[in-house]
Structures are given as structure tokens and as C-alpha cells.
Amino acid sequence: KEGYLVSKSTGCKYECLKLGDNDYCLRECKQQYGKSSGGYCYAFACWCTHLYEQAVVWPLPNKTCN
């Protein structure tokens, strides 16, 4: 599974500016989803890879980013 890293409190994606390999996204994905996950910046938001099936990713039901 893969998807955009999301803030559970706001429903917002984690923004990033440096597209492609991105240390910030990699660090945040690993922190939220575990050491086996990966991450990079895609369309100015952190995209996480190698997630477990139950991982919560954007969009969150009933939570819009505002």
C-alpha cells in the first residue's frame, strides 16, 4: 500500500517543496508508519510507500483540510 502522509488532527497532507528524494518525507513516513516504509515528495506532498494494509493515508473520512 502507498499514499499521502496525513495529519490525523487536521486531515491535511504533509507539504514538501523539494520533489523526488526528500529527507523530510522519508523521516516523517518512517516515524508514522515504521522503519520498513519509504517516502518521497510527489506533487508537493509527502508520498509514503511500503505501508501495511491498515495504514491511514489521505484523505481522511469526515476530515477536510482547512
From Swiss-Prot:
Effect of N66R: Non-amidated peptide that is less potent than the native peptide
Keywords carried by this UniProt record: Amidation, Disulfide bond, Ion channel impairing toxin, Neurotoxin, Secreted, Toxin, Voltage-gated sodium channel impairing toxin
Domain LCN-type CS-alpha/beta: 1-66
Alphabetical GO biological process terms: defense response
Places the protein is found: Secreted
Molecular function GO terms recorded: sodium channel inhibitor activity; toxin activity
Keyword Kinase: no
Tissue occurrence: Expressed by the venom gland.
Protein name as it appears in the record: Beta-mammal toxin Css2
Organism: Centruroides suffusus
